[in-house]
Amino acid sequence: MPTQAANEALAILRDASQFQWYVITLLLVVIYIYASEIHQKNYRAVFAGLAFWGMDWFNEIWNALVFHFTNYAAVWMAPGKTAYLILIGLNIEISMMFAIMGVAATKLLPEDRKAKIFGINNRIFYAIVLSAACVVVEIILNAANVLVWEYWWWNAKMPLLIFLIGYLPFFLVAYWVYDMDLVEKQAAVSFGILAIDAVLLIVFAGLMEWI
Protein backbone atom coordinates (compact mmCIF):
# COMPACT_ATOMS: atom_id res chain seq x y z
CA MET A 1 0.00 0.00 0.00
CA PRO A 2 1.48 3.39 -0.97
CA THR A 3 2.63 5.74 1.76
CA GLN A 4 0.98 9.11 2.27
CA ALA A 5 3.90 10.87 0.57
CA ALA A 6 3.66 8.51 -2.40
CA ASN A 7 -0.05 9.21 -2.79
CA GLU A 8 0.55 12.95 -2.54
CA ALA A 9 3.20 12.75 -5.25
CA LEU A 10 1.02 10.61 -7.50
CA ALA A 11 -1.80 13.13 -7.15
CA ILE A 12 0.26 15.81 -8.90
CA LEU A 13 2.44 13.62 -11.13
CA ARG A 14 2.78 15.30 -14.53
CA ASP A 15 -0.18 17.56 -13.75
CA ALA A 16 0.20 20.57 -16.05
CA SER A 17 -2.20 22.61 -13.92
CA GLN A 18 0.63 22.95 -11.39
CA PHE A 19 2.61 25.13 -13.82
CA GLN A 20 4.15 28.36 -12.54
CA TRP A 21 5.74 31.08 -14.68
CA TYR A 22 9.01 31.09 -12.75
CA VAL A 23 9.90 27.91 -14.65
CA ILE A 24 10.52 30.06 -17.72
CA THR A 25 13.04 32.13 -15.77
CA LEU A 26 14.78 28.99 -14.50
CA LEU A 27 14.91 27.62 -18.04
CA LEU A 28 16.47 30.85 -19.27
CA VAL A 29 19.12 30.63 -16.53
CA VAL A 30 20.03 27.11 -17.68
CA ILE A 31 20.13 28.19 -21.32
CA TYR A 32 22.28 31.22 -20.46
CA ILE A 33 24.81 29.11 -18.55
CA TYR A 34 25.22 26.60 -21.37
CA ALA A 35 25.23 29.29 -24.05
CA SER A 36 27.97 31.15 -22.19
CA GLU A 37 30.14 28.03 -22.04
CA ILE A 38 29.56 27.33 -25.72
CA HIS A 39 30.40 30.95 -26.60
CA GLN A 40 33.68 30.56 -24.73
CA LYS A 41 34.26 27.24 -26.52
CA ASN A 42 34.40 25.54 -23.14
CA TYR A 43 32.80 22.42 -24.53
CA ARG A 44 34.21 20.15 -21.86
CA ALA A 45 32.15 22.00 -19.23
CA VAL A 46 29.07 21.68 -21.43
CA PHE A 47 29.45 17.94 -21.84
CA ALA A 48 30.40 17.45 -18.19
CA GLY A 49 27.18 19.25 -17.28
CA LEU A 50 25.10 17.13 -19.64
CA ALA A 51 26.70 13.94 -18.33
CA PHE A 52 25.93 14.99 -14.76
CA TRP A 53 22.33 15.76 -15.70
CA GLY A 54 22.00 12.44 -17.51
CA MET A 55 23.30 10.54 -14.50
CA ASP A 56 20.59 12.10 -12.36
CA TRP A 57 17.91 11.14 -14.87
CA PHE A 58 19.08 7.52 -14.68
CA ASN A 59 18.80 7.58 -10.89
CA GLU A 60 15.37 9.16 -11.05
CA ILE A 61 14.13 6.47 -13.42
CA TRP A 62 15.20 3.54 -11.27
CA ASN A 63 13.89 5.35 -8.21
CA ALA A 64 10.46 5.59 -9.84
CA LEU A 65 10.65 1.91 -10.75
CA VAL A 66 11.22 1.07 -7.09
CA PHE A 67 7.81 2.54 -6.35
CA HIS A 68 6.23 0.65 -9.23
CA PHE A 69 7.50 -2.70 -8.03
CA THR A 70 6.96 -2.14 -4.30
CA ASN A 71 3.70 -0.18 -4.53
CA TYR A 72 4.88 1.31 -1.24
CA ALA A 73 7.35 4.13 -1.81
CA ALA A 74 10.18 5.28 -4.01
CA VAL A 75 13.56 5.63 -2.33
CA TRP A 76 13.05 9.40 -2.40
CA MET A 77 9.92 11.36 -3.26
CA ALA A 78 9.11 15.01 -3.89
CA PRO A 79 5.43 15.45 -2.97
CA GLY A 80 5.66 19.13 -2.08
CA LYS A 81 4.77 22.27 -4.03
CA THR A 82 6.24 22.32 -7.52
CA ALA A 83 5.54 23.79 -10.93
CA TYR A 84 5.69 20.29 -12.44
CA LEU A 85 6.43 16.86 -11.01
CA ILE A 86 8.13 14.87 -13.76
CA LEU A 87 8.71 11.63 -11.85
CA ILE A 88 7.80 10.66 -8.31
CA GLY A 89 11.13 11.94 -6.99
CA LEU A 90 11.94 14.55 -9.62
CA ASN A 91 10.32 17.92 -10.10
CA ILE A 92 11.18 20.51 -12.73
CA GLU A 93 13.05 22.65 -10.21
CA ILE A 94 15.30 19.77 -9.15
CA SER A 95 15.97 18.81 -12.77
CA MET A 96 17.08 22.32 -13.70
CA MET A 97 19.28 22.47 -10.62
CA PHE A 98 21.04 19.28 -11.71
CA ALA A 99 21.42 20.67 -15.23
CA ILE A 100 23.39 23.56 -13.74
CA MET A 101 25.28 21.74 -11.01
CA GLY A 102 27.50 19.71 -13.32
CA VAL A 103 28.75 22.84 -15.07
CA ALA A 104 29.24 24.65 -11.76
CA ALA A 105 31.24 21.72 -10.37
CA THR A 106 33.84 22.06 -13.12
CA LYS A 107 34.60 25.65 -12.10
CA LEU A 108 36.44 24.41 -9.02
CA LEU A 109 38.87 22.24 -10.94
CA PRO A 110 42.49 23.27 -11.46
CA GLU A 111 43.88 22.82 -14.96
CA ASP A 112 46.31 20.19 -13.70
CA ARG A 113 44.16 17.09 -13.41
CA LYS A 114 46.88 15.38 -11.37
CA ALA A 115 47.23 18.13 -8.75
CA LYS A 116 46.53 17.02 -5.20
CA ILE A 117 44.62 18.62 -2.35
CA PHE A 118 45.47 17.27 1.11
CA GLY A 119 47.18 14.39 -0.67
CA ILE A 120 44.09 13.49 -2.68
CA ASN A 121 43.70 13.89 -6.43
CA ASN A 122 41.77 17.13 -6.92
CA ARG A 123 39.04 15.49 -9.03
CA ILE A 124 38.35 12.91 -6.36
CA PHE A 125 38.65 15.50 -3.60
CA TYR A 126 36.04 17.80 -5.11
CA ALA A 127 33.76 14.89 -6.00
CA ILE A 128 33.81 13.80 -2.35
CA VAL A 129 33.39 17.29 -0.91
CA LEU A 130 30.59 18.30 -3.25
CA SER A 131 28.79 14.98 -2.80
CA ALA A 132 28.95 15.40 0.97
CA ALA A 133 27.63 18.96 0.66
CA CYS A 134 24.73 17.73 -1.46
CA VAL A 135 23.87 15.09 1.13
CA VAL A 136 23.74 17.80 3.80
CA VAL A 137 21.35 19.81 1.62
CA GLU A 138 19.18 16.73 1.11
CA ILE A 139 19.02 16.15 4.86
CA ILE A 140 17.82 19.74 5.29
CA LEU A 141 15.21 19.27 2.56
CA ASN A 142 14.07 16.07 4.22
CA ALA A 143 13.77 17.85 7.56
CA ALA A 144 11.59 20.43 5.79
CA ASN A 145 9.43 17.54 4.52
CA VAL A 146 9.78 18.52 0.88
CA LEU A 147 12.00 15.52 0.10
CA VAL A 148 10.61 12.38 1.70
CA TRP A 149 12.46 9.18 2.58
CA GLU A 150 10.61 6.07 3.77
CA TYR A 151 13.31 3.38 3.91
CA TRP A 152 15.54 2.87 6.95
CA TRP A 153 18.64 2.41 4.82
CA TRP A 154 18.20 5.75 3.05
CA ASN A 155 17.78 8.54 5.58
CA ALA A 156 19.58 11.14 7.68
CA LYS A 157 20.87 8.48 10.07
CA MET A 158 22.14 6.34 7.19
CA PRO A 159 23.56 8.87 4.71
CA LEU A 160 26.23 6.61 3.20
CA LEU A 161 24.08 5.27 0.36
CA ILE A 162 22.83 8.76 -0.45
CA PHE A 163 26.47 9.78 -0.77
CA LEU A 164 27.65 6.70 -2.70
CA ILE A 165 24.66 6.27 -5.02
CA GLY A 166 22.88 9.59 -4.96
CA TYR A 167 25.79 11.90 -5.75
CA LEU A 168 29.35 10.59 -5.93
CA PRO A 169 28.93 8.83 -9.31
CA PHE A 170 27.48 12.04 -10.79
CA PHE A 171 30.55 14.10 -9.99
CA LEU A 172 33.01 11.33 -10.90
CA VAL A 173 31.40 10.83 -14.31
CA ALA A 174 31.20 14.58 -14.94
CA TYR A 175 34.89 15.02 -14.13
CA TRP A 176 35.80 11.96 -16.20
CA VAL A 177 34.02 13.48 -19.20
CA TYR A 178 35.56 16.89 -18.48
CA ASP A 179 39.07 15.43 -18.66
CA MET A 180 38.62 13.50 -21.89
CA ASP A 181 41.09 14.53 -24.57
CA LEU A 182 38.66 14.73 -27.47
CA VAL A 183 35.41 16.67 -27.69
CA GLU A 184 34.03 13.82 -29.77
CA LYS A 185 34.51 11.42 -26.85
CA GLN A 186 32.90 13.86 -24.45
CA ALA A 187 29.91 14.24 -26.75
CA ALA A 188 29.61 10.49 -27.28
CA VAL A 189 29.56 9.69 -23.56
CA SER A 190 27.23 12.55 -22.61
CA PHE A 191 24.75 11.95 -25.40
CA GLY A 192 25.06 8.21 -24.82
CA ILE A 193 23.94 8.60 -21.21
CA LEU A 194 21.06 10.84 -22.25
CA ALA A 195 20.08 8.42 -25.03
CA ILE A 196 19.86 5.55 -22.52
CA ASP A 197 17.71 7.76 -20.30
CA ALA A 198 15.45 8.61 -23.24
CA VAL A 199 14.96 4.94 -24.14
CA LEU A 200 14.16 4.05 -20.53
CA LEU A 201 11.64 6.89 -20.31
CA ILE A 202 9.99 5.87 -23.58
CA VAL A 203 9.70 2.27 -22.40
CA PHE A 204 8.78 2.67 -18.73
CA ALA A 205 6.89 5.98 -18.79
CA GLY A 206 5.53 6.06 -22.32
CA LEU A 207 4.83 2.48 -23.40
CA MET A 208 4.43 0.57 -20.14
CA GLU A 209 3.25 3.51 -18.02
CA TRP A 210 5.05 2.14 -14.97
CA ILE A 211 6.53 5.45 -13.89
UniProtKB/Swiss-Prot annotation:
The keyword Methyltransferase does not apply. It is a multi-pass membrane protein. It comes from the Archaea. It is found in: Cell membrane. GO terms for cellular component: plasma membrane. Keywords: Cell membrane, Membrane, Transmembrane, Transmembrane helix. The chain crosses the membrane at residues 21-38, 53-75, 82-104, 124-146, 159-178, 188-210. The keyword Protease does not apply. This is Uncharacterized protein AF_2236. The lineage of its organism: Archaea, Methanobacteriati, Methanobacteriota, Archaeoglobi, Archaeoglobales.
